[in-house]
Amino acid sequence: MPNSIESRLRRARQTRAKIAELKVVRLAIHRSNSHIYAQLIDGSGSKVLASASTLEPELRKELPNGGTVTAAAVVGKRVAEKARGLGIETVAFDRSGFKYHGRVKALADAARENGLKF
């Protein structure tokens, strides 16, 4: 019986395979206990176009803790602004097997509110 990490990675592989068939820009996220990371990856999957995370110096000054829903919303807003700067409006959301809840949902909602279409 697979443990929770193996199950998450299996879900992530399935999602990435479906997104790869579409050849669209992918908004990939990663969540750790302390931080959240977001990357815009091109359709071929070989190039990171933009990224944002709670490790960026500007955000570290602004946020006392990088592992909160508020921090995730700020990262979502920031990655959406960077995407608009590159002329990207539509992305496929790759939640990396994480449940669409809490910080993952906050990041996605903030990105949508700031102009990204999923």
Swiss-Prot record:
InterPro entries linked to this entry: Ribosomal_uL18_bac-type, Ribosomal_uL18_bac/euk
GO cellular component: cytosolic large ribosomal subunit
Gene Ontology molecular function: any one: 5S rRNA binding
Key words, A-Z: Ribonucleoprotein, Ribosomal protein, RNA-binding, rRNA-binding
Pfam families: Ribosomal_L18p
Domain of life of the source: Bacteria
UniProt key word Magnesium: no
GO-annotated biological processes: translation
Family stated for the protein in its record: Belongs to the universal ribosomal protein uL18 family.
Free-text function comment from the UniProt entry: This is one of the proteins that bind and probably mediate the attachment of the 5S RNA into the large ribosomal subunit, where it forms part of the central protuberance.
Protein name (Swiss-Prot/TrEMBL): Large ribosomal subunit protein uL18
UniProt organism field: Nitrosospira multiformis (strain ATCC 25196 / NCIMB 11849 / C 71)
Gene name of the encoded protein: rplR
